[in-house]
A protein has these predicted regions:
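Short, well-ordered alpha-helix to beta-strand connector turns
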Residues: 17, 48-49, 204
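A structural signal for the hydrophobic beta-strands that form the central parallel beta-sheet
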Residues: 21-22, 53, 209
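Short beta-strand to alpha-helix junction loop
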Residues: 1-14, 21, 147-154
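Conserved flavin/dinucleotide-binding core of flavoenzymes
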Residues: 114-240
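A conserved beta-strand/loop element that lines the FAD pocket in flavoprotein oxidoreductases
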Residues: 16-28
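Mid-domain catalytic core of redox enzymes
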Residues: 27-148, 153, 165-166
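Short glycine-/acidic-enriched loop or helix-start segments at secondary-structure transitions
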Residues: 25, 62-64, 188, 219-220
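Generic solvent-exposed, charged/amphipathic alpha-helical segments
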Residues: 10-15, 61, 65, 156-164
Length: 240
């Protein structure tokens, strides 16, 4: 793990690259006489010779339907799930097992799908025990998916109940945080590599894609997908 979180790494990469980082969302991608015009959510228009679209699969079709319909159609076939993460800081000295966590099978009476004992997995920070519980599974409806339908207070209550059930822990957390990832967990079903090949094949030469829905959801796989995307655009520029 990166000390201070991945934000530290991103900030340092931006600093060393000497680039301008505009923290806006792109809402439209259009062809331009010499490349592409990208419109952000503040209405500003950006000109680009080439672009890497590093967005979740559900966002991709709305950006490129008009310029890469084959890619848009392939992206729509990638199913996704939503999840809510509950991070708790428990008082130090709580008797937790020396394991990294627990995966919960569907059908169990726990609401959590996974419990990560963060202090055991990544090392302790201060006099607290950090734990993380995940809620929401692929296949949940919009009404039953915890990430979409449950409030923060409900999630915190479920987390306390699940910790008590699994570990016998009944304490008030020192601190807590709830974060939701909506439609952000791509599902790798049968034939996924062929689907990704079709998705990439439909892109214009100076557009590329990157993200966890392509070649794997882990950090190394995402870095590799981004490197591949950037390299393809460099090659396209050289070919021109």
């Amino acid at each position: 793990a990166v000390d201070g979180g991945y934000g530290v790494l991103v900030d340092e990469l931006v600093r060393r690259a000497g680039i301008r980082w505009a923290q806006v969302a792109i809402v439209q991608v259009c062809r331009a006489p010499h490349g592409w015009e990208l419109v952000d959510d503040e209405g500003q228009r950006w000109q680009a010779d080439a672009a890497v679209l590093a967005v979740p699969a559900p966002w991709l079709p709305r950006l490129i339907e008009g310029v890469a319909p084959r890619t848009a159609a392939a992206a729509r076939r990638i199913e996704v799930a939503s999840t809510a993460l509950v991070a708790l800081a428990l008082p130090g000295g709580i008797p937790l097992p020396e394991q990294s966590g627990v995966l919960v099978a569907s059908g169990e009476r726990l609401r959590a799908k996974a419990i990560t004992l963060s202090s055991r997995k990544w090392g302790r920070r201060g006099n607290v025990e950090l734990v993380r519980l995940s809620y929401g599974r692929f296949g949940d409806s919009a009404e039953t998916n915890a990430a979409r339908s449950a409030g923060d207070e409900d999630l915190l209550e479920w987390a306390s109940q699940d910790l008590a059930t699994v570990f016998g822990v009944n304490v008030e957390p020192v601190d807590c945080h709830v974060h939701r990832w909506i439609d952000a967990m791509p599902q790798y079903g049968p034939g996924h590599p062929d689907l990704v090949t079709d998705l990439r094949a439909g892109l214009p030469q100076t557009l590329a894609v990157a993200g966890g829905y392509l070649d794997g959801i882990g950090v190394p796989a995402c870095v590799a997908a981004a490197t591949r995307a950037a390299a393809s655009l460099v090659a396209a520029r050289v070919a021109r």
